[in-house]
Amino acid sequence: QYYGCNAVPGGGLYVLSDPFGENPQLRNLLENSVVEKGRLKGRKLDSGTFLSPELSFDGKTILFAYTQAKAWAKYQGKTAYEWSPEYSYHIFRCNADGTGLVQLTDGSWNDFDPCFLPNGRIAFISERRGGYLRCGRHCPVYTLHSMADDGSDIIRLSHHETHEWHPSVANDGMLVYTRWDYIDRDTNIAHHMWSCFPDGRDPRSYHGNYPQRRESRPW
């Protein structure tokens, strides 16, 4: 479960130069960068946690998720988890050299796993649709969304009731992702690959939709 409240501060966005040579070099891409747009404008991203970097098709732009990873009091005396922007993941964009750093999403929910779409939009995973897991009522659900490349026009692509992860674009232009689907089946075996059109239409499972029972698997 990719919740910013579970993240430990540390790390960064790095590039490994000459990775297969005799002297590979690791470089902090954002070492001299400050956020140019968004709630964290004017600040460096040097004290939080990074997740799911994504390179554009032309190799010029990078998307990633970042949380400030501030301290969080579990449950806060309530029956459901409630986040604040300071310990939620948000999506950022920068140029391949680390310049042009801007914040695209914000709010009291986690946004992560950004993915460039061929039509210029960005697919990502978000808790914005609302709802909680059936087997963990206090845990917010995150599913497929998309937005314009400047963070505007956010659209929900999936209404599924449990988590989805890792969107990517297949060679035929379809959006491929994983989904936790345990309706009428065991809880922990159905994290399989699904596909849909980039606008969310026609979600389908590649594997069929009736996996074996957990007890019948060799592990």
Protein language model features and the residues they cover:
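Beta-propeller domains
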Residues: 1-43, 68-87, 92-96
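A conserved hydrophobic secondary-structure block that centers on an alpha-helix together
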Residues: 59-65, 69-71, 86-106, 110-111
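Beta-propeller blade signature
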Residues: 9-18, 82-97, 139-151, 190-201
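Multi-bladed beta-propeller domains
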Residues: 20-48, 95-110, 147-162, 197-217
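WD40 beta-propeller repeat blades
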Residues: 168-174, 179-190, 195-219
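Conserved beta-propeller blade repeats
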Residues: 46-55, 61, 109-122, 161-176, ...
